[in-house]
UniProtKB/Swiss-Prot annotation:
Disulphides: none
Any GO BP annotation: ribosomal large subunit biogenesis
Subunit-structure text: Associates with the mitochondrial ribosome large subunit (39S) via interaction with MRPL12 and/or MRPL14. The interaction generates steric hindrance that is expected to prevent premature association of the 28S and 39S ribosomal subunits. Identified in a complex composed of MALSU1, MIEF1 upstream open reading frame protein and NDUFAB1; within the trimeric complex, MIEF1 upstream open reading frame protein functions as a bridging scaffold that interacts with MALSU1 on one side, and with NDUFAB1 on the other side. Interacts with MRPL12 and MRPL14.
GO CC annotation, single: mitochondrion
Native source species: Mus musculus (Mouse)
Compartments, record wording: Mitochondrion matrix
InterPro entries documented for this protein: Iojap/RsfS/C7orf30 (IPR004394), NT_sf (IPR043519)
Function of the molecule: Required for normal mitochondrial ribosome function and mitochondrial translation. May play a role in ribosome biogenesis by preventing premature association of the 28S and 39S ribosomal subunits. Interacts with mitochondrial ribosomal protein uL14m (MRPL14), probably blocking formation of intersubunit bridge B8, preventing association of the 28S and 39S ribosomal subunits. Addition to isolated mitochondrial ribosomal subunits partially inhibits translation, probably by interfering with the association of the 28S and 39S ribosomal subunits and the formation of functional ribosomes.
Molecular function, one GO term: mitochondrial large ribosomal subunit binding
Protein name: Mitochondrial assembly of ribosomal large subunit protein 1
Region (Disordered): 53-77
Chain ranges passing through the membrane: none
UniProt keyword annotations, A-Z: Mitochondrion, Ribosome biogenesis
Amino acid sequence: MGPGWSPARRLWPLLWRRAVFQRAGPAMASVPWLPRLAERWLPARPATCLTPSLTRGLHHGPQPEERTAGDARLQPGPADHIGAKFDIDMLVSLLRQENARDICVIQVPPEMRYTDYFVIGSGTSTRHLHAMVHYLVKMYKHLKCRSDPYVKIEGKDADDWLCVDFGSMVIHLMLPETRETYELEKLWTLRSFDDQLAQIAAETLPEDFILGLEDDTSSLTPVEFKCK
């Protein structure tokens, strides 16, 4: 290294090329040395990290500078999904991120053969419910594997209740008053208990039960009992 060498002088050509590349846009994409340069100098990081830019893109679509580079390069490939999975932890995290209230997760017994997890959440308004569903579905499509089932949405035209079936998870998003009316939590967690309770007859006192009497008077006639 000569006496005039400095890190700034070494990095200046790279910064200049990067600025030219950003200004030129798609025209520079065909230059063969650019991918090698990016591969050499850009730090490696997990492609599945939910960075603010990725979250912003999922909410509002690609930014103007991203759209100019072509939609084909924005499509995620199989390598982009390594390490990320749309499971119950991811679902609950996204619901909390979208300010869902009173999240309830119920693990469904396997013998029911319906789903693995039954999730219930509340929204503050109809718009909030639809926004949460839209975001969940968008994230699922972004992270899903080819073998994962398609999403099924029920209640698209409803104002107070939407249901999304992800296959291994089913989520119900409702307004608080609707949730209080149907009480799905009790239906899925206390159903056997409620069925047994419904079979019990109304409470009645047995014929041989007399409140507050300790002595055995079963052998006495009504007249003798009254005199005693």
